[in-house]
């Protein structure tokens, strides 16, 4: 724990720094501050009261203060608290993450004649040392995957699904079929519990490539209308889903019959011939391979930056991210990989450790990318910001955002879009040649 002081003509501030970026601060204000706050408080109260013999807002100050002393005092304390927080945010080099990061604030004294003091407890932005670029360990880029004939044939099979005959059948499901599933969660034995959909009419291909062995075993050789009820033993999953009974329903078993691709079908896809379609498909697969290489390089750069340096992180952000990732990983294991309760219990500790490590990496990168963005002198154009705002808007509202979107929502979209672009540009800078990262810390 370390203690430091900051001061100007109006305020003096003492802070004590603790682990987890937790800071306790004492803000002392001289009488000029409380006198100004008192004057503003009196003005605010006066304009809202009517006294006999005076027009609204025109009553003498001494009468208003005498009759409405409680309201004046409340407004004085509110204004003084705000002024103290603004001073803390402007003068101190351990600024609060946001107003919401303030855990507690208490006015110790507040007097127009003698000044006042406020105690704050809050989480601050982390202190990040200079980045040792010479220690950056970034592997060489992997070569772009070459597209094989097998890749091309598999691509053609996927294209053929466009022309496939999809026939609902009454026979039991078999390898290669698609099934439509709905999954609901409810509370076992609770007559007032209304089943809640986790998903409805979701299609799955019965194959080793698209299903885990246990999931496939549940829905192989079953017919339309088949139901699987499964109790949830894990207390974590019960808590996440607010229920303890999963009900799968097979809505349909669908037989897929894909034709052989030929010139005629290729022309329906805007190709001149089957060979021309193969050429276009190869170009598409090559572009996908380049994108995969780019994503791998991006991921390597994230890892390299996260491992470059350690520093203290805000504990609430770390805790929130860890809780979110723990939930995602446990639910993914239970509902996507279809682990049993016993299998989930065996994997739980490893999944939680993984979530903890991933959370720390994510929060570190949140602040490190901002530092890289600043040190590298990166920028965001108006066109880039507008494009990313459109992306964020579609994610939140779908294709048709509301016409009466509020200014607050617009500001939120701007902040989210800017954060995403800051992160992406910083990581892409890391993924460039190492020598380009030799910067002088600001």
Swiss-Prot record:
Cellular component, GO, one term: cytoplasm
Alphabetized InterPro entries for the sequence: PPIase_dom_sf, Trig_fac, Trigger_fac_C, Trigger_fac_C_sf, Trigger_fac_ribosome-bd_bac, Trigger_fac_ribosome-bd_sf, Trigger_fact/SurA_dom_sf
Domain PPIase FKBP-type, chain residue ranges per copy: 176-259
Role this protein plays: Involved in protein export. Acts as a chaperone by maintaining the newly synthesized protein in an open conformation. Functions as a peptidyl-prolyl cis-trans isomerase.
Enzyme nomenclature, EC number: 5.2.1.8
Entry similarity comment: Belongs to the FKBP-type PPIase family. Tig subfamily.
Main location per the UniProt record: cytoplasm
Domain remark from Swiss-Prot or TrEMBL: Consists of 3 domains; the N-terminus binds the ribosome, the middle domain has PPIase activity, while the C-terminus has intrinsic chaperone activity on its own.
Keyword flag Chaperone: yes
Top-level taxon: Bacteria
Name assigned to this protein: Trigger factor
Catalytic activity line of the entry: [protein]-peptidylproline (omega=180) = [protein]-peptidylproline (omega=0)
GO biological process, any: protein transport
Species lineage: Bacteria, Pseudomonadati, Chlamydiota, Chlamydiia, Chlamydiales
Keyword tRNA processing in annotation: no
Localization of this protein: Cytoplasm
Organism: Chlamydia trachomatis serovar L2 (strain ATCC VR-902B / DSM 19102 / 434/Bu)
């Amino acid at each position: 724990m370390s203690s430091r002081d900051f001061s100007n003509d109006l305020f003096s501030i003492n802070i004590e720094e603790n682990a987890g970026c937790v800071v306790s601060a004492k803000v002392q204000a001289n009488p000029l501050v409380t006198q100004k706050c008192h004057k503003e408080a009196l003005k605010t109260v006066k304009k809202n009261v009517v006294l006999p013999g005076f027009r609204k807002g025109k009553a003498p100050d001494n009468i208003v203060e005498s009759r409405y002393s409680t309201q004046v005092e409340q407004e004085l304390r509110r204004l003084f608290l705000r002024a103290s927080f603004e001073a803390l945010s402007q003068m101190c080099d351990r600024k609060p993450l946001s107003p919401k990061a303030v855990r507690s604030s208490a006015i110790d004294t507040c007097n127009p004649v003698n000044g006042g003091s406020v105690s704050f407890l809050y989480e601050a932005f982390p202190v990040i040392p200079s980045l040792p670029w010479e220690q950056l360990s970034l592997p060489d880029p992997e070569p772009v995957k070459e597209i094989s004939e097998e890749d091309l044939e598999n691509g053609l099979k996927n294209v053929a699904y466009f022309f496939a005959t999809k026939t609902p059948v009454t026979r039991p499901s078999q390898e290669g079929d698609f099934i439509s599933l709905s999954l609901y969660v409810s509370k076992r034995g609770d007559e007032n519990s209304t089943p809640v959909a986790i998903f409805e009419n979701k299609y799955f291909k019965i194959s080793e490539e698209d299903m885990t062995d246990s999931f496939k075993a549940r829905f192989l050789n079953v017919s339309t209308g088949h139901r699987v009820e499964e109790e949830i033993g894990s207390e974590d999953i019960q808590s996440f889903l607010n229920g303890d009974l999963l009900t799968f329903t097979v809505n349909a078993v669908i037989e897929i019959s894909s034709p052989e691709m030929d010139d005629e079908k290729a022309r329906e896809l805007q190709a001149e011939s089957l060979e021309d379609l193969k050429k276009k498909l190869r170009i598409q697969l090559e572009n996908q391979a380049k994108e995969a290489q780019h994503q791998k390089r991006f991921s390597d750069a994230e890892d390299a930056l996260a491992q470059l340096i350690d520093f203290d992180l805000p504990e609430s952000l770390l805790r929130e991210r860890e809780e979110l990732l723990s939930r995602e990983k446990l639910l993914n294991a239970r509902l996507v990989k279809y682990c049993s309760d016993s299998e989930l219990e065996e994997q739980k500790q490893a999944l939680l450790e993984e979530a903890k490590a991933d959370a720390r990496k994510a929060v570190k990168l949140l602040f490190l990318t901002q530092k890289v963005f600043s040190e590298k002198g990166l920028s965001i154009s108006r066109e880039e910001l507008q494009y990313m705002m459109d992306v964020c808007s579609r994610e939140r509202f779908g294709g048709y955002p509301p016409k009466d979107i509020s200014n607050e929502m617009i500001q939120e979209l701007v902040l989210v879009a800017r954060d995403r672009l800051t992160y992406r540009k910083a990581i892409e800078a890391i993924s460039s040649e190492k020598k380009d990262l030799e910067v002088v810390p600001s």
